[in-house]
Swiss-Prot record:
This is Polyribonucleotide nucleotidyltransferase. Involved in mRNA degradation. Catalyzes the phosphorolysis of single-stranded polyribonucleotides processively in the 3'- to 5'-direction. InterPro entries: ExoRNase_PH_dom1, ExoRNase_PH_dom2, ExoRNase_PH_dom2_sf, KH_dom, KH_dom_type_1, KH_dom_type_1_sf, NA-bd_OB-fold, PNPase. GO terms for biological process: mRNA catabolic process; RNA processing. Belongs to the polyribonucleotide nucleotidyltransferase family. GO terms for molecular function: 3'-5'-RNA exonuclease activity; magnesium ion binding; polyribonucleotide nucleotidyltransferase activity; RNA binding. Pfam families: KH_1, PNPase, RNase_PH, RNase_PH_C, S1. CDD domains: KH-I_PNPase, RNase_PH_PNPase_1, RNase_PH_PNPase_2, S1_PNPase. It is found in: Cytoplasm. Residues 554-613 form the KH domain.
Length: 712
């Protein structure tokens, strides 16, 4: 690899993308600086010289955000970046997933790919720059990576597909798709959509793949110019004689154990075979390396037999047909004090989702490398160890939990009613109670049930299903509603969520080089059939959202005030609004256009707060009559409170019909009197009269008396 700085450029969606090599991070196995517009990402790849003594490929991908990239200084006392943001974690997963399948089986050297975001142009995706940079850093290095790969974001505006849409274009788009792959096939999909038909999603994926091919050709030119020769690495292999001996000892019994339909009984049967074989070699005092190889051989026996049964005999581990969905059971309203709850069970996978409604002030503020914005819909996913019958420390959410939560959020967001139609913040929490595959999709189904139970007026119910694939040469079998073993030992995990009308979210991960259009098309159509079946089941439990909210959910009333009056409601340093909140216990959120949201569990307090605000913003008109309380008495007259925050003066000459010597002779502080507005001067001061009303009353009485006399 040349140590001189070299620069390569290509046009990407009308903006220049530049790759620089040979100047930065030269001690890494591979390093590139990718500039896309004003976005700049440094991507590096390093690998250990020796293989690690582990039974998996130790790859770590880190997408590192630096706030200097957008000219910000971190908040807090420490003033430096802390733990990765949710966006950074999701970006790390996005890069990891298409890269991981492109390392050889048996490769055990530790590999770390790090992308540091150094400058951000909001219209030029730093995630896509990091994905390209990660692929290039590996490809030009001596690490035996079988890439390159590339990624592209695809939007659709007015029926036209757009590559790498700008922020403004994303707001208009009904598809938000990230697709990645090699020049020959697609190996990763992540998408959100607004109930888009399967055929359109497939076209969007293939449209993105056309751009991927162009970006890979660009990378191949760079590799040709500056790439290092790949290292010769010894791949992990088991001893041939040991392999034959273990297979003779275990294969027959393992084949029988695999065909036990119930998950735990099947696992017990498989573990019993493993235990017998391991104990045999332990009795022969086999060393740790030999025992490790024995475990590897036993794993391969299980994998090969499961795949053979599915592709050749068309038998799944639990006895189902390829397109068969496990038994479904659902229930709503099982938690009395929550605002809404839904329990969704599919075979041995179970999720309990809880919906909580809050005021608009409860929105989540997102402040990272992107434009600062708020989020009024949230979905969080928890995967406790008891869901798989295991024990482990209870810690915060990991990458997988954050990823599954984000997938559920993306699937449900298109059907959430607008703020205008439903002025609430909505938070969903999905607790996985049992796991045997497809828990993320169960959480989507449970969340739909919970929101319908809570009375959220969804545009349409959403269900999710996980599709699998087992491929052997040109032969393949697509599986609906995969369970844990099929996910673990198969070639694909393709999650599809949506309504009866179309797709709202996709996520695809594969363990092989890639998938053809034909397989993707078949998987999407089979997923649609399964999704509609699940939706019909859910609607048999609750046909439509409840018309009334829970008694324990906040009641929200909306009112509109003159925007010029907002400062009056807030008051100096928030004094006025805090007084209202303290007096009524409500939450108040005010938009710049003068829309006011008042929320509380107590409707009476909502009404009280509304009345106070109405009084504050009310405009006094000449001729209006008020019943007010005397707040202050002066020699020249009395000050009367017409309503909260608005006083007027009754001059001494306007207190009574007769001449008044002292104000106190007529009124005192605390008296409630009826007054009429007779003038509002240029300074906005309100002049009142009691005398005018007394005179009007006197004239009415005189007229009545006159009428009575005429009748006599």
């Amino acid at each position: 690899m040349s140590q001189e700085k070299q620069v390569f450029s290509i046009d990407l969606a009308g903006r220049q993308l530049t790759v620089e090599t040979g100047q930065l991070a030269k001690q890494a196995n591979g390093a590139v600086l990718v500039r896309y517009g004003d976005t700049a990402v440094l991507s590096t790849a390093t690998a250990s010289k020796e293989a690690k003594n582990v039974d998996f490929f130790p790859l770590t991908v880190n997408y590192e955000e630096r706030l200097y990239a957008v000219g910000k200084i971190p908040g807090g006392f420490i003033k430096r970046e802390g733990r990765p943001s949710e966006k950074a974690i999701l970006a790390s997963r996005l890069i990891d997933r298409p890269i991981r399948p492109l390392f050889a089986d048996g490769f055990r050297n530790e590999v770390q790919v790090v992308s540091i975001v150094m400058s951000v142009d909001q219209d030029c995706s730093s995630e896509m720059a990091a994905m390209l940079g990660s692929s290039l850093a590996l490809s030009i290095s001596d690490i035996p990576f079988e890439g390159p790969i590339a990624g592209a974001t695809v939007g659709r505006i007015n029926g036209e597909f757009v590559i790498n849409p700008t922020v403004e274009q994303q707001e208009q788009s009904d598809i938000h798709l990230v697709v990645a792959g090699t020049k020959d096939a697609i190996n990763m999909v992540e998408a959100g959509a607004d109930q888009v038909p399967e055929e359109t999603m497939l076209e969007a994926i293939m449209f993105g793949h056309d751009e991927i091919k162009r970006l890979i050709a660009f990378q191949e030119e760079i590799v040709q110019a500056v790439g290092k020769e790949k290292s010769e690495v010894k791949l992990y292999e088991v001893d041939a004689d040991l392999n034959q001996a273990v297979r003779e000892m275990a294969e027959k019994d393992m084949h029988s154990a695999i065909q036990v339909h119930e998950k735990h009984a099947r696992e017990d049967a498989i573990n019993e075979v493993k235990k017998r074989v391991i104990e045999h070699y332990e009795a022969e005092e086999a060393d740790a390396d030999t025992l490790g190889q024995v475990n590897e051989i036993l794993y391969k026996i299980v994998k090969e037999e499961v795949r053979r049964l599915i592709t050749v005999e068309k038998i799944r581990p639990d006895g189902r047909k390829g397109d068969e969905i496990r038994p479904l059971a659902s229930e709503v309203g099982i938690l009395s004090r929550t605002h809404g709850s839904g329990l969704f069970t599919r075979g041995q996978t179970q999720a309990l989702s809880i919906c909580t409604l809050g005021a608009l002030g409860d929105v989540q503020i997102l402040d990272g490398l992107g434009v600062e914005e708020s989020k009024r819909f949230m979905h969080h996913y928890n995967f406790p160890s008891f869901s798989v019958g295991e024990t482990r420390p209870m810690r915060g959410p990991g990458r997988r939990e954050i990823g599954h939560g984000a997938l559920g959020e993306r699937a449900l967001e298109p059907v959430i009613p607008s703020e205008k139609d439903f002025p609430y913040t909505v938070r969903l929490v999905s607790e996985v109670l049992e796991s045997n595959g497809s828990t993320s999709q169960a959480s989507i189904c449970g969340s739909t049930l919970a929101m319908m139970d809570a009375g959220v007026p969804l545009k349409a119910p959403v269900a999710g299903i996980a599709m699998g694939l087992v491929k052997s040469g040109e032969h393949y079998t697509i599986l609906s509603d995969i369970q844990g073993m099929e996910d673990h030992l198969g070639d694909m995990d393709f999650k599809v969520a949506g309504t009866a009308q179309g797709v709202t979210a996709l996520q695809m991960d594969i363990k092989i080089d890639g998938l053809s259009r034909e397989i993707l098309e078949e998987a999407l159509q089979q997923a649609k059939i399964g999704r509609v079946h699940i939706l019909n089941h859910m609607l048999s439990v609750i046909a439509e959202p409840r018309t009334e909210l829970s008694a324990y959910a906040p009641k929200i009333i909306t009112m509109t005030i003159n925007p010029d009056k907002i400062r009056d409601v807030i008051g100096p340093s928030g004094k006025q609004i805090n007084k209202i909140i303290e007096e009524t216990g409500v939450k108040i959120d005010i938009e710049q256009d003068g829309t006011v949201f008042i929320s509380s569990i107590n409707q009476e307090m909502n009404d009280k707060a509304k009345k106070i605000i109405e009084d504050i913003v009310r405009e006094v008109q000449v001729g209006e009559i008020y019943e007010g309380k005397v707040k202050r008495v002066e020699k020249f007259g009395a000050f009367v409170e017409l309503f909260s925050g608005k006083d007027g003066l009754v001059h001494i000459s306007e207190l009574a019909l007769e001449r008044v010597g002292k104000v106190e002779d007529v009124v005192k502080i605390g008296d409630v009197i009826t007054v009429k507005v007779i003038e509002i001067d240029k300074q906005g001061r309100v002049n009142l009269s009691r005398k005018v009303l007394l005179k009007e009353e006197q004239e009415k009485e005189a007229a009545k008396e006159e009428d009575k006399q005429e009748q006599q």
